[in-house]
Amino acid sequence: MSITAAQVKELRELSGAGMMDCKAALMETNGDIETAVDWLRKKGMAKADKKAGRTAAEGLIGIASKGLSAVVVEVNSETDFVARNDAFQTIVRNVATAALDTEGSVESVSASIYPGSEKTVEEAIKDAIGTIGENMAFRRSAKLSVQNGAVATYIHNSVADGLGKLGVLVGIETTGDKEVAVDFARKVAMHIAATNPLALTVADVDASIVEREKAIFSDQARQSGKPENIIEKMVEGRIRKFYEEVVLLSQAFVMNPDVTVEASLKDAEKMIGAPAKITGFVRFALGEGVEKEEVDFAAEVAAAAKG
């Protein structure tokens, strides 16, 4: 089959492998990008990608909090120009505010009342599309609540209050000092923004992901020619390392890389004055997993000339 330069470029960006290696991988996997990444990894030519996903959508991430709950939403626009528009930013902020009084799903938020009006969120967004003159979409939403403690929030590279390109929520349960607890949880939120963990604990990691990693590590280890019992130990070691890379509590804390997030939490309990537990987190990066349509500029000009 014919492999395009665009496919090779995309695989290089995802895998960090060389151009010819990427081309060979695509030929071997009939042009399937995700399978090609695995093929390269088995050959030892690519790095592990914790969350492969093409990021291309414009828009904003919005965060709002109230009491023991916080929400994070993503609203997409077609261009970054509109995302910088005050009217669009107001919409994202109001969608986040509306989400606080729901259970957090896109469906429930869309059906809720848009702040300051009698319309639903869905209706308000449709009206805004007509006013702003550009398509927009309320793509996703999540809510995090605690029973006794706090939910810390963090926006990376904020463009306005509660708005940016990446947002994180972290729940922390404790009966101790809430201000100290939320300050620590916010540092954990900054850590999550930087490291993008897959799960809170080892038990939370999707079993299919672990099996996939084991298969890749086994293939890599067998290339060493070592006996099966040694290969088994090598794979166990690689899986332990994998958990240290993708599990929040097992990761080296960005604020103090000499200790894990879990150990840092134990340390923080002394200042909090009571046991504390991170109960969950949510991380939204703008456009995660969305592939933007690529426009052939020459074809677009030709079409315009014809018509």
Swiss-Prot record:
Keyword presence, Nucleus: no
Subcellular localization, as worded in the UniProt entry: Cytoplasm
Keywords for the protein's UniProt record, in alphabetical order: Cytoplasm, Elongation factor, Protein biosynthesis
Any one Gene Ontology cellular component term annotated for this protein: cytoplasm
Region (Involved in Mg(2+) ion dislocation from EF-Tu): 79-82
Signal sequence, renumbered to the chain: none
Protein name: Elongation factor Ts
Domain of life: Bacteria
Family: Belongs to the EF-Ts family.
An annotated Gene Ontology molecular function: translation elongation factor activity
InterPro entries the record matches: EF-Ts_dimer_sf (IPR036402), Transl_elong_EFTs/EF1B (IPR001816), Transl_elong_EFTs/EF1B_dimer (IPR014039), Transl_elong_Ts_CS (IPR018101), UBA-like_sf (IPR009060)
Pfam name, any one: EF_TS
Function field: Associates with the EF-Tu.GDP complex and induces the exchange of GDP to GTP. It remains bound to the aminoacyl-tRNA.EF-Tu.GTP complex up to the GTP hydrolysis stage on the ribosome.
